[in-house]
A protein has these predicted regions:
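Contiguous, glycine/small-aliphatic-enriched amphipathic segments in soluble metabolic enzymes
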Residues: 1-97, 134-223, 227-252, 256-258, ...
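Conserved hydrophobic/aromatic beta-strand scaffold that supports enzyme active sites
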Residues: 98, 110, 119-121, 251
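Short beta-strand
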Residues: 111-112, 155
Length: 284
């Protein structure tokens, strides 16, 4: 029976309660064993501290070890506090980068998927001011190929993928920036030469997400974190799932944070965690 690992996240957050609710929901597929990793006694709901951050990190490290050394099929990660982790010396911007390193992956990407939208990110956890410096054709090629592979794995034989511009109006032919002409368009041409999916763009960012949500495209490649996540969370907040693409084994997580302010109050919705576990089972 395939084993799906679930890390508790920061035990001072809503991770423990949404995992309990998901496992009790009756909405998970049969034929899998679910193994929860983490020490819930290390945190008091709503009161994050170094001990709760340490417990979150210990759970991640144990999950990575099990993925490397056992037949565990996939991991679903509970929400962590990036700030809390960095205070105890965690050297990565987020869990995506942690698993890339821990599982010795060479090319990974971050994708979020919900009922209305699937969005891949060309850049991830960097300051907005750094995006123009860090955006290059290789980023776009990489996430484009990974996103096409993800869609095919989910049964879409000929994916249609829209690639966003970076600037307002997708640069308006150079009037508002040159990244579209110099970086994004060449990457789209390379992706189409690879023949793995139909890539179009650079699209005007403010319009393309509506088209994608209505089914014109199977996914959108966004140039930076909030460009992709604002429309996704507006439409799919309760059911969106974060997926790390390119790992040797699937990793998913809910698309929300620790929600320390409501932890322990019994009001956190488990929908995104349920969706994350279901997707991990599909991909395993």
């Amino acid at each position: 029976v395939p084993e799906i690992l679930i890390t508790l996240g920061d035990p001072a957050g809503i991770g423990p309660e949404i995992i309990d609710a998901a496992l009790a929901s009756g909405n998970l597929p049969d034929g899998f064993d679910f193994r929860v990793i983490g020490d819930r006694s290390a945190g008091t709901p709503g009161k994050p501290d170094r001990a709760s951050a340490r417990a979150a990190l210990d759970a991640l490290e144990e999950a990575a070890r099990l993925l490397r050394e056992t037949d565990a099929a996939a991991v679903v990660t509970g929400p962590v506090s990036k700030e809390g982790l960095q205070e105890i010396g965690f050297p990565f911007p987020g869990q995506t980068e942690f698993f890339t390193h821990a599982l010795h992956a060479t090319e990974t990407g971050m994708l979020l998927t919900g009922p209305h939208l699937t969005v891949g990110l060309a850049t991830i956890h960097i300051p907005l001011a750094e995006v123009p410096n860090q955006l290059n054709p290789q980023n776009i090629l990489s996430i484009g190929k990974l996103t096409a592979g993800f869609l095919k794995q989910r049964g879409i034989a000929q994916p249609r993928i829209a690639v966003c511009g970076l600037n307002p109006h997708a640069g308006e032919n150079g009037a508002f920036g040159h990244e579209e002409r110099n970086i994004i368009s060449p990457a789209i041409a390379s992706l189409n030469r690879a023949g793995i999916a139909t890539f179009t763009g650079p699209h005007v960012p403010d319009a393309v997400f509506r088209d994608a949500a209505q089914g014109t495209y199977h996914a959108v490649i966004a140039m930076y974190h909030d460009q992709g996540l604002i429309p996704l969370k507006l439409l799919d907040f309760d059911e969106a799932v974060n997926v790390t693409l390119g790992l040797p084994k699937p990793r998913t997580s809910p698309d929300h944070g620790t929600a320390f302010a409501i932890a322990g109050k019994g009001i956190a919705k488990p929908d995104s965690m349920i969706a994350a576990i279901r997707l991990a089972c599909q991909l395993a």
